[in-house]
């Protein structure tokens, strides 16, 4: 980052406890803008709100890299598309085999099927069909929930109700 030039940087995170590399980013950024959803550090609000506010004040970006929850990346891409800022996203759908054979990480990007495990995980954010990707994520929620119950309940977990403690 430093060798290309000193530029504007924006970090957006849920809360202060999740912030990493702030001092390292300050060393390579002319200006570092930090946004936390809960206001525990820096700008209070959503990263898109701060980005729009900075844009309105004349701060310009030549590109954006968005990494995080799909819903956040969707709205970052919606805004950056309106502002004409090229945007790369790092997609993180569930990946099962890492070869593309299972299809678990299938995405639509620019109207074409792509697999995050072999074609990505970085893609042009303005080309990703986030609505479809988020719907596909939901298909694993039941299994994720059962796995979480098993982790929390240990040997007393027998099938998903989370209450019986008996045999399935």
How would you describe each model-predicted region?
Residues 16-168:
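Reductase modules of NAD(P)H-dependent flavoproteins
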């Amino acid at each position: 980052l430093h060798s290309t030039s000193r530029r504007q940087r924006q970090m957006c995170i849920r809360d202060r406890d999740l912030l990493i590399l702030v001092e390292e980013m300050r060393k390579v950024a002319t200006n570092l803008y930090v946004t936390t959803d809960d206001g525990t550090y820096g700008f209070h609000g959503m990263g898109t709100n701060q980005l729009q506010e900075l844009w309105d004040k004349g701060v310009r970006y030549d590109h954006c890299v968005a990494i995080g929850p799909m819903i956040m990346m969707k709205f970052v891409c919606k805004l950056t598309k309106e502002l004409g800022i090229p945007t790369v996203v790092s997609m993180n759908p569930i990946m099962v085999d890492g070869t593309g054979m299972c299809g678990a990480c299938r995405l639509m990007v620019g109207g074409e099927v792509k697999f995050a495990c072999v074609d990505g995980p970085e893609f042009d954010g303005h080309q990703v069909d986030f609505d479809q990707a988020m719907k596909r994520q939901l298909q694993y929620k039941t299994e994720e929930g059962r796995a979480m119950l098993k982790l929390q309940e240990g040997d007393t977990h027998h099938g998903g109700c989370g209450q019986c403690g008996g045999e399935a």
